[in-house]
Amino acid sequence: MAAATVGRDTLPEHWSYGVCRDGRVFFINDQLRCTTWLHPRTGEPVNSGHMIRSDLPRGWEEGFTEEGASYFIDHNQQTTAFRHPVTGQFSPENSEFILQEEPNPHMSKQDRNQRPSSMVSETSTAGTASTLEAKPGPKIIKSSSKVHSFGKRDQAIRRNPNVPVVVRGWLHKQDSSGMRLWKRRWFVLADYCLFYYKDSREEAVLGSIPLPSYVISPVAPEDRISRKYSFKAVHTGMRALIYNSSTAGSQAEQSGMRTYYFSADTQEDMNAWVRAMNQAAQVLSRSSLKRDMEKVERQAVPQANHTESCHECGRVGPGHTRDCPHRGHDDIVNFERQEQEGEQYRSQRDPLEGKRDRSKARSPYSPAEEDALFMDLPTGPRGQQAQPQRAEKNGMLPASYGPGEQNGTGGYQRAFPPRTNPEKHSQRKSNLAQVEHWARAQKGDSRSLPLDQTLPRQGPGQSLSFPENYQTLPKSTRHPSGGSSPPPRNLPSDYKYAQDRASHLKMSSEERRAHRDGTVWQLYEWQQRQQFRHGSPTAPICLGSPEFTDQGRSRSMLEVPRSISVPPSPSDIPPPGPPRVFPPRRPHTPAERVTVKPPDQRRSVDISLGDSPRRARGHAVKNSSHVDRRSMPSMGYMTHTVSAPSLHGKSADDTYLQLKKDLEYLDLKMTGRDLLKDRSLKPVKIAESDTDVKLSIFCEQDRVLQDLEDKIRALKENKDQLESVLEVLHRQMEQYRDQPQHLEKIAYQQKLLQEDLVHIRAELSRESTEMENAWNEYLKLENDVEQLKQTLQEQHRRAFFFQEKSQIQKDLWRIEDVTAGLSANKENFRILVESVKNPERKTVPLFPHPPVPSLSTSESKPPPQPSPPTSPVRTPLEVRLFPQLQTYVPYRPHPPQLRKVTSPLQSPTKAKPKVEDEAPPRPPLPELYSPEDQPPAVPPLPREATIIRHTSVRGLKRQSDERKRDRELGQCVNGDSRVELRSYVSEPELATLSGDMAQPSLGLVGPESRYQTLPGRGLSGSTSRLQQSSTIAPYVTLRRGLNAESSKATFPRPKSALERLYSGDHQRGKMSAEEQLERMKRHQKALVRERKRTLGQGERTGLPSSRYLSRPLPGDLGSVC
């Protein structure tokens, strides 16, 4: 992958670089006239088609043969070996192969003449041979059908953790073999490479895909992919193979190429991934802008690479970088290997041999295809007989050179600045003659010059030769003499310009000749290629019209000043860079490489009539009969003149009108720039008063709250989704409890989701805290604005002058408008913050229980009151079960959960009832009786208290009948002036009830009911821990509407809670105070009689165990009946 940054500024002097058609980058030494794959400064390859491994020394790479054997390439010594250069061991992948080292691992002449039929990553390198003769040196005796792919786990490129990540996320990837199932993988796009992992922890890379050699696009119907939001990554070589072969699928897989299919979850994710991956795939073309990746990809025949003829060894090709700086082999990207099995790959072994080889070569393409295919890159050896080079301005060759050398398809020619003006004049005449003869040739004119003096029109009978000593590009693949042209291509592209060229390629020569616009368009392309090749906007190339060439050379050869330059459209113009001084360049090198951003990312720029050669220029192609505004190619450097072809075939008046229109367009552009410069530099005052400042800050805080609300809402949605999925996994865990394999998979998924859930909850809590802080600040600002409003209203009332009142009124209106606009969101913010502070459902008590006041500050704290841990509000069933639970709770003199609170009289409306029948919290154990009451009697021994557990069946039946009758008679609704007893008190406590009821300030207010709980009095002189632990804390709940008369009544002893527990009375009816007291009195009498009856029997049973004591009999606390 990209181990070094490519760029003109990063290269030393006399160095340049070239880009192969498949995206590989090599470097050219203009002094030694040789090529290398290694960057001259870093000593590492940038993109040579092989893998860079971290465990290899500098200048080493790993390659793979067609059979799948791994070998190592030393670009420093230009050798290959199967052994690791550091460990000296064979790769574990080669265990199934029989490897045989050759004594001379360098490439031989015979090897360079033969082209392997398939190779890794669409490259022809020294290490990717498929035959015994064309291998990197070591022989592979065992042949195998194993196909290497970068996406495999073992051959994956190691990811550099220091490179920032562009995009990461989940995608579905289709398997390359088997049933081609879709698997969900975690993908990371970094360092122009797509890595994928099993999960988001990114622990072990499953595979990697180097994107610069791929094109990413949505799936097509022929892909037979029915999955939604699917897209694919197709290798550039695969694309040409698909368009040229009907059986490209299997052949592509067999030749080492592969198409990757991906699927996103949403359309937005798919668009984002396709955009990011395409940008990574085109990074080389964007960084250099010397060759547009889109155009390189569109070319239907292999584009020749930079190839240098080395003086020491007389060889050409980027193979120098793999084998040696002075020896190498052809490294040609062949996109049509399936159709060209018999073609031969030749290299220049010596000047004479090279001439003989090139004289035999023939071009299978028509002249129009020649121009269309070799427009952007100065291609390989396609020229006339070599002649001594002469220095010409801008790299233009004298007229004696064949036009094929000047139209961008000739060999590389070194050029130097001119010294005399006659040379410039000769250049103009030469170019003019070339244009005319080329136009005649396109129209089939028999009066054209001899074949070797025309523009690029090379037929089968034309002889080809090279300049003698220095070639920039290797030979492109050619058909044998007499071979037919390849079928038309239709390569997709993002630019309309590419579509025009693709449709142009589909046309036959006759159609092209018949289409008059096609001729003009080809002439325009040739002109632009000439100017691009020679790298200067001031190279005067005056073109004649095809219509004028038939009438002679003397008509209307307009030479328009080069400064008149009309861009095609503002969106196609890259912004001009700052002026820089560049060292002497190669003639065909563009003056500047400018990154062209997509249209949606460009900013509008103004292009002036600057004379800088680095300004991008556009042009609208027109003729007399058809006006077609074509899109120009996005190139780092393009020179478009107003002269050619938009002025062809027009009279003087038409030409004047055309030039006037162009100048008006430029005037408009200049007007915008002048207005920009003449803008007033008057400072801007945002706020006029402190009211403006305060309101702006207030609105800013509202925006902060909105952003936080959006984040919290998104996090909550993610949390809910994760929790729902985890709930399903929990059910699956229970369902597949007997299947360990399923359990392991489910547990692994559950672990990952739980980690994500923890992360989301932590983020949600953090955002909620920020939301709460922002809300507090919002309330503070709101209060400040309200105070400011009141102040302004007061000033408005006291203001005397009309102007002052008007200004204050404006400020008041501003405040009113802002507050009215913000009021819509305020309620949402408040609900969100309150949901965090006070959630609706409180399953676990997050706060202490409601506090209980004491009788006085001098009294000691009451003993603890145990409570069920499940809910702070006790249900009626829990109240009945509570005495049984109290037996096992030890005594604590200072309970931590009880605190003193404000008296209910001070805040009588704080308690908000929700359910009328819910019982209030149970009060703590009482300590003292009121002074006027008699002290209670000593409770009975534990063995007597347990007799109630052995009540006879007849006694229990009698109690049950009485309770049933009471329920039938007591179904009445309490009024506000009636007393409702929620629990039961003993007889000594009833004696003091009248005094307690007169003191409502000592009561408890339930949190969700309107009842006041009056705590009963405990034992004043009790010292026994057993007695205290076994004493039940009775309490009475009264309506707040109690009057003094009803509170002074003397109540009989009610039935204890323990008796109610054994009686099974689970439905309590609402009874009046009189009915309830009467019922309790009857029960008390029945209990006393029953106790006396069974007293003797209880002494004989002998079960005195305090551990089983639930509570003392309430009747024994003071039997007054």
Swiss-Prot record:
Source organism of this protein record: Homo sapiens (Human)
Modified residues (Phosphoserine): 536, 545, 569, 604, 608, 612, 858, 860, 867, 871, 903, 907, 986
Keyword tags: Cell junction, Coiled coil, Cytoplasm, Cytoskeleton, Phosphoprotein, Repeat
Protein name per the record: Pleckstrin homology domain-containing family A member 7
Domain PH: 164-282
UniProt-annotated stretches for the region Interaction with CTNND1: 538-696
Pfam families: PH
Lineage of the species this protein comes from: Eukaryota, Metazoa, Chordata, Craniata, Vertebrata
Coiled coil residues, start to end: 700-801, 1067-1094
Phosphothreonine, modified sites: 870
Disulfide bonds: none
